[in-house]
């Protein structure tokens, strides 16, 4: 459960992302594909090269979904229900991949905002991303 301090930390950190959520999402996806090559199997039709339009497009979707989650932290299940259905029933993404992407998102955020990425902010973002992952995998059960 996210504490009020966690929610404030997440909102403050995400505000630094600004209009670059899609870029951060694409960068995190690229990191994931490079660091965890098995994740590429979910994107056989994508050009996974650096800067590809398809990775940027999916990164934008990731960024938009996270922005929605940040704006609806008190109702993540409601805010992410459609996305949860998509990943569970249609795409059938292995739940571990959400943890891998979450890790890559943390690294991306830390690289772009090293001064603001304190241990407390890191912990809050980690809890937030774990909550998002839990919601996205909740319909697998």
Swiss-Prot record:
Q: Which UniProt keywords apply?
A: Heme, Iron, Metal-binding, Oxygen transport, Transport
Reply yes or no: does the keyword Plastid apply.
no
Q: Which GO terms describe its molecular function?
A: haptoglobin binding; heme binding; iron ion binding; organic acid binding; oxygen binding; oxygen carrier activity; peroxidase activity
Q: Which CDD domains match?
A: Hb-alpha-like (cd08927)
Annotated positions binding O2 = 58
Is Methyltransferase one of the keywords UniProt gives this record? no
Q: Which domain of life is it from?
A: Eukaryota
Q: Which InterPro entries match?
A: Globin, Globin-like_sf, Globin/Proto, Hemoglobin_a-typ, Hemoglobin_oxygen_transport, Hemoglobin_pi
* Residues in Globin domain copies: 1-141
Q: Name one GO biological process term.
A: hydrogen peroxide catabolic process
Where would one find coiled-coil regions in this protein?
Answer: none
Assembly information from the UniProt record = Heterotetramer of two alpha chains and two beta chains.
Q: Which family does it belong to?
A: Belongs to the globin family.
- Quote the protein name from its UniProt record: Hemoglobin subunit alpha-1
Per the UniProt record, the source organism is Tadarida brasiliensis
